Amino acid sequence: MPSYRAPKIAAAEITPERFFLDRRTFIAAAAGSLALSVPKPSRAAALEASKSTYRADDPATPEKDATTYNNFYEFGTGKGDPAANSANFKPAPWTVKVDGLVGKPREFGLEELLAFPLEERIYRMRCVEAWSMVIPWIGFPLAALLDRVEPLGSAKYVAFETVVRPEEMPGQSGYFQPLEWPYREGLRLDEARHPLTILSVGLYGKTLPNQNGAPIRLVVPWKYGFKGIKSIVRISLTETPPPCTWNLAGPSEYGFYANVNPAVDHPRWSQATENRIGEGGFFGANRRDTLPFNGYAEDVASLYAGMDLRVNF
């Protein structure tokens, strides 16, 4: 696997102002704040994180836009539904079960997850719906967690599941369900272990809001946003490709790989351009060209050498 070549840091990048807590008090404070945040998900703890060289060249999307324009069907299908309907969701206490083809299956509590060395990474995020953002995530490499459980040689894929709590997630209740729960996603093991792939516990210097996937979510910046599964409760290593929610719902529209590709259109719209949220102009003005692999081709294209990306979309 090629080593990551960090892009240059542009002077125009927005670094949000925030304060930092002592490392020991931070872990307890962050976990405690999540527990106390119900039903006020806006109350978030500041997160201590080192500034990584993994930074997009673009200015960050305004925090208000990134936390009020979301896809999280567990809270509703409208873009404003997750922020409006997630106040009763309880992101603490929390555990993530890691099992399957591993030598040391175990559960990770929230304080253990927050204790991983955290970095701020400013990534581009491209939705399959042809809009995008630039978000300062806080998290740690997924590979660091996988190393703790010692994947077996037979493990080829990594499967993920979101929590199911219809009493707290109104999109999971009711007669009509837009998707099958739990929400599931998957990656090849080499994708999961790539340095760009992280588990995020925060954004904009604070713990994740409920509507953005609290308390922990996946971020894979060269893939469409639906691969970034939220509110993860289980990670399993498997030998075969795991089922993925949107791929099951519409296999001709949402592929397993879901790599950002301007040359492969969605059956119902073009993927050649995108609207950057916060800049306006969805119907033509201020649209920008979509980059192969969302601008990360130099670092990840070799993962798919020899593959027909029109077939393996």
UniProtKB/Swiss-Prot annotation:
<comment type="subunit">
    <text>Heterodimer of a catalytic subunit (MsrP) and a heme-binding subunit (MsrQ).</text>
</comment>
<feature type="binding site">
    <location>
        <position position="212"/>
    </location>
    <ligand>
        <name>Mo-molybdopterin</name>
    </ligand>
</feature>
<keyword id="KW-0500">Molybdenum</keyword>
<dbReference type="GO" id="GO:0030091">
    <property type="term" value="P:protein repair"/>
</dbReference>
<keyword id="KW-0732">Signal</keyword>
<dbReference type="InterPro" id="IPR000572">
    <property type="entry name" value="OxRdtase_Mopterin-bd_dom"/>
</dbReference>
<feature type="binding site">
    <location>
        <position position="162"/>
    </location>
    <ligand>
        <name>Mo-molybdopterin</name>
    </ligand>
</feature>
<dbReference type="GO" id="GO:0016672">
    <property type="term" value="F:oxidoreductase activity, acting on a sulfur group of donors, quinone or similar compound as acceptor"/>
</dbReference>
<feature type="binding site">
    <location>
        <position position="217"/>
    </location>
    <ligand>
        <name>Mo-molybdopterin</name>
    </ligand>
</feature>
<keyword id="KW-0574">Periplasm</keyword>
<comment type="similarity">
    <text>Belongs to the MsrP family.</text>
</comment>
<protein>
    <recommendedName>
        <fullName>Protein-methionine-sulfoxide reductase catalytic subunit MsrP</fullName>
        <ecNumber>1.8.5.-</ecNumber>
    </recommendedName>
</protein>
<feature type="binding site">
    <location>
        <begin position="228"/>
        <end position="230"/>
    </location>
    <ligand>
        <name>Mo-molybdopterin</name>
    </ligand>
</feature>
<feature type="binding site">
    <location>
        <begin position="73"/>
        <end position="74"/>
    </location>
    <ligand>
        <name>Mo-molybdopterin</name>
    </ligand>
</feature>
<keyword id="KW-0560">Oxidoreductase</keyword>
<dbReference type="InterPro" id="IPR036374">
    <property type="entry name" value="OxRdtase_Mopterin-bd_sf"/>
</dbReference>
<dbReference type="InterPro" id="IPR022867">
    <property type="entry name" value="MsrP"/>
</dbReference>
<keyword id="KW-0479">Metal-binding</keyword>
<feature type="binding site">
    <location>
        <position position="127"/>
    </location>
    <ligand>
        <name>Mo-molybdopterin</name>
    </ligand>
</feature>
<comment type="function">
    <text>Part of the MsrPQ system that repairs oxidized periplasmic proteins containing methionine sulfoxide residues (Met-O), using respiratory chain electrons. Thus protects these proteins from oxidative-stress damage caused by reactive species of oxygen and chlorine generated by the host defense mechanisms. MsrPQ is essential for the maintenance of envelope integrity under bleach stress, rescuing a wide series of structurally unrelated periplasmic proteins from methionine oxidation.</text>
</comment>
<feature type="signal peptide" description="Tat-type signal">
    <location>
        <begin position="1"/>
        <end position="46"/>
    </location>
</feature>
<dbReference type="GO" id="GO:0043546">
    <property type="term" value="F:molybdopterin cofactor binding"/>
</dbReference>
<dbReference type="Pfam" id="PF00174">
    <property type="entry name" value="Oxidored_molyb"/>
</dbReference>
<feature type="binding site">
    <location>
        <position position="70"/>
    </location>
    <ligand>
        <name>Mo-molybdopterin</name>
    </ligand>
</feature>
<dbReference type="GO" id="GO:0046872">
    <property type="term" value="F:metal ion binding"/>
</dbReference>
<dbReference type="GO" id="GO:0042597">
    <property type="term" value="C:periplasmic space"/>
</dbReference>
